């Protein structure tokens, strides 16, 4: 399979994407939407299987290997700065404590966000990771050339009021939207709708998480309620998402068992949505999902996925 070969599955989502990104009136934005018809390698928090997640080292590795998108979670500090950090709290991936949005940027910059990786992965330990800083969005955007695309999540917007306005303002200042260099994702539908209102040219991805329903054995539900479960979802349900988004980002497995099927993927595509699956690290699962006609995969190991798709 060629790295950017158009998928064999006949997709209709491109025309829908153009409709839902206003005029799509710049060549670069139109090219981005066209590229979403091909398979996309999405580096989950950078090459986070090889270096501390959301660190400059992880991002640089993923970019050097040729990932299509560098994926990051965006949160807001107590003094209104945008930073790249996944968890709501600091303990897992830094030597800090408490909620990230309770700290100023200066306080966060004093933390070590790299040594935990060396302790967790001694075979991959690198002294250069010690003392890695939590990155601001501006630092990330300033580091990479204009050919790099980003896949940014509004993380926990209920804990980060104003994150949408701050993010859109920053992306506009860096000409990220008109140049076709950004996708925004969220589990929070209201957050995506707010971004769509702020700038309808931004391509959006609705994240979903399917898991067994507590009250009904064998039935799957989506945890935020944005869609029914995969076994009950209709064309109309997909179309409601396509009113504001160009794609779905979904889990493939729950507790080791598949929660979506190839038919689900094809139905989403037929209703105007690209389908990206998170987070896939095993080569056999990567290959299975590629064979299903997936539009892209999130992975901690972009090198594995790139080797598979070249």
Predicted regions and their residues:
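Bacterial N-terminal signal peptides that target proteins for export
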Residues: 1-9
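Extended, charged low-complexity regulatory segments
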Residues: 4, 20-21
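Bacterial N-terminal signal peptides
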Residues: 9-19
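Phosphate-group recognition and catalysis centered on beta-loop-alpha active-site segments
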Residues: 23-310
